[in-house]
Amino acid sequence: MKEFIAKFSPLNFLMLLAAGIINAIGVTLFIAPVQLYDSGISGTSILLSQLTPDYLSLSFFLILLNIPLLLFGFKRQGAVFSIYAIFTVCVYSVAAWLITDVLPIDVSIASPLSGTDLFLCALFGGIISGVGSGLAIRYGGAMDGIEVVAVIFAKPLGLSVGTFVLIYNVLLYMICGIVMGSWILPLYSIVTYAAGSKTVDFIVDGLDSAKAAMIITTHPDEIARAVSEEFGTGLTIID
């Protein structure tokens, strides 16, 4: 038990706490108030929160959709990664709930650019949420269950992880456009996705590229699990 606990780092938990809060700020103050959509499960949660009664909030769907996916990936990704990821998602969900439902804040007014410039909302929302997601990955967790799903199902479908996530988001934005009866907001959401993706790449690789490594192996599952448990970091499997 002590050996297992020793695998976790207080610094990682602190940075994942910050990551969840930062991501919640980006989504609740820049993206959601102007009806834009984040990527992955976060974007799916935003859409569902728009289509359901008010008491089914964004934070409710974040937990409802993300936690089962992260638990589903427990065996593939290892205990350390799964616990870090679940912690991050819970922080993100609670922070989003506090901002939108508890604190005396009118989010539509508090959003600096709400109702004035959709492009800037999309851009800065993507950058801020990208910082949160990047920090989550950098310190061994994940902000979105779609990453776990991609790692598990991309290979059987003959796709890379990045391509799987891209296809999911394209389908998500198409569904948003059809359901909401407008393509303007889904198209602006692509800006959010692009800005977020570039920011994640910069946070994960750009600040410390010397520690990036590619491992070529015929046993990806075993190595991914061992590296995740030993170093507390996330991995991307490229087929």
Where are these regions (language model features)?
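Core subunits and conserved enzymes of cellular information-processing
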Residues: 2-221, 230
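Cytosolic Rossmann-like ligand/nucleotide-binding regulatory domains
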Residues: 156, 234-239
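Hydrophobic structural segments
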Residues: 221-224, 235
